[in-house]
């Protein structure tokens, strides 16, 4: 047996012994009738205590004679004979406990406290004071075991380092990694901030079906499920768009939804099959109004959540304070591939030759618009680091967007990029029912030709448009990618609490 294997075997034995010991301790608690009590009530969290009392001197705390009750997980413990220091962790952070044998009821210190383990959940009451080093602490007069942890915590110095284990056992990741906890707190703040921003602008939050008979609103491969009661195959939604626009037809002129979408596609640092989107629809507006809204939303969130409009992402500083750059798709191609002859982008054969010269495999079903879009994605997208709006998307790749009045080959659409990634997609909505019907037919033809991401024909949606959709603009923003930017995270799994994972065999 190699030394490495021997160490691994020893670790397994040590773990098994610890599990056995902890279960024996729980059995003893059960015999005493004190396992898992539920009558302890705290009155402060650690962050509340630090916010209110960190600025006070010990003399002030002694004069105030403040008694508090806290609860949380025991992360560290230093036993020094008749007294000990404990680090207690709760939702707000950490607070130090000073535990002295003679200040607790008889037997608690030696017979209970010293037998508890790291990871156990405790309740503590006592008076606030500051140590000689100035650390805010609680001098405990009551200490109780609220939950016995049967498994040990990850190594206290290194936390949970294995990346896959962090995703599979997110609870351990949250216990041991401050950075992960902060990421998901920021995510929650972003969601709350978006909702407040939207309500302030007169939008109503709604919910639309997660299971749909016809998946629409995006070009993607759907997940299929079966509804037993209806004996009907259904699809997990790839987007809520068509239902939200039905609501605008119905008279709800400003609606938004924050919820999950599902796309049966690959997993990468940018993609998770289940992801969160915010979609909004605004009557009597066009895509330019949504460019303004998007810019204002990101600037507001950065200022409110981070306290500044400059956001560090990797080795760059993203500036949400200055006006965002705006380029047409063709301008972006020219900027990042200067040798491009713009006239070649108007000719199918010339554009195809450019695409193939940069390694793009051109499918038979692609038209000129799709080829130009693929060229843009290949040569320009990764360079769009600072917030940038790309406009004038071809109609071929924008089946739900309104055609431009001057050039019907393009649409009144934009995509929003930060850090070389698409963050949002918005456009003036197509409200011509006959044009929409024809574009659905074009999508059906593309699907028949082998494009499994092409859209289905949605007859009911066309019928809704025939009743009249006001001039409307719509926008979708990827929440997960937004959170990645605001938390300096470089893989989408770091900002999703429970990302899709292959089961452990």
Curated annotation (Swiss-Prot):
GO terms for biological process: lysyl-tRNA aminoacylation; tRNA aminoacylation for protein translation. It is found in: Cytoplasm. The keyword Repressor does not apply. Mg(2+) 2 binds at residue 422. One of its GO terms (cellular component) is cytoplasm. Keywords: Aminoacyl-tRNA synthetase, ATP-binding, Cytoplasm, Ligase, Magnesium, Metal-binding, Nucleotide-binding, Protein biosynthesis. It comes from the Bacteria. It holds the Pfam family tRNA-synt_2. One of its GO terms (molecular function) is tRNA binding. Belongs to the class-II aminoacyl-tRNA synthetase family. There are two lysyl-tRNA ligases in E.coli: lysS is expressed constitutively, while lysU is heat inducible. HAMAP family: Lys_tRNA_synth_class2. This is Lysine--tRNA ligase. It comes from Escherichia coli (strain K12). The gene is lysS.
